[in-house]
Amino acid sequence: MKIFKQLFSAVFLPLSLFAQEPSEATSEETYSEPISTFSSTRVINGHSVETLSKGTYEFRIEHRFGDIAGVNGGVQQMFGFDNLSDMRIAMEYGITDQLMVGFGRSKGTGAPYRSLVDGFVKYKVIGQEPKKSPISITAVAGSSFTYMTAAPDEGLVTHFPKAVHRLNYFAQIHVAHHFGDRGALQVSPTLVHRNYVASTDVNDLFALGISGRIRLTSRFALVGEYYHCFNGSQFRQTGFTNSGALALEWFTFGHNFTINLTNSGGIGETQFIPYTSEQWQKGQFRLGFTVGRKFVIE
């Protein structure tokens, strides 16, 4: 926990100080209202600081293929296109301009879970505005529940002696700053709690996410994110790794389309943060895409 606080301070404090100086290339007229730091409520795998506006629905489809290379990839698997690591379908809704909720269903990777339903609540505490706030701050909390058939082996985390063991939780604070009209940076202190883990693992896992966005044109942007896990046991250090992703984002009014490259097979904070085991250097990374469609029902 001490290491987590120290690293958060090292990243967050310089960002806050720098954020107090507006870009010389940005006029006050440009930022006459709250600034949108990202174009979507997600960066790639993880949440962004953004929320849906009041009365807006968003239908989302997230898809992750199999390994491009390595022992499970290559030409025989059409570089991962023959396989499906995970897929999520979700509906999200903006209750107010600051508060939104979402619900989804994921296939699951099977490492360790399959057949998951999830939900979250997200609230924007403050938005970046000129002369008011140099940063945006958003809080999000959620949970996932697996309804897969319990494993008969009592030594597996999918044995589920009790129904509550099927639940996992996460909580995050997202802090972001928009630099001029091209760049954005976000830090995301994260806590993931799992009700049932291996005897050599830990229930509570702290992580720090760092995300960035560079706008290329009025329609395209490059985005990236990395989640570093802390307080891991020896079990976690040998069996799991950190999640990273890069993506090309294409956005239009009402639509957001992202083509991504990531080493994480699972979708959702309770999956990709604690259970990413694939390694970039072994070719265990995959293509994926996310499609979001916003609409209003009157």
Regions found by a protein language model. Give the residues of each.
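Generic secretory/membrane-interface signal
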Residues: P14-L15, S115, R219
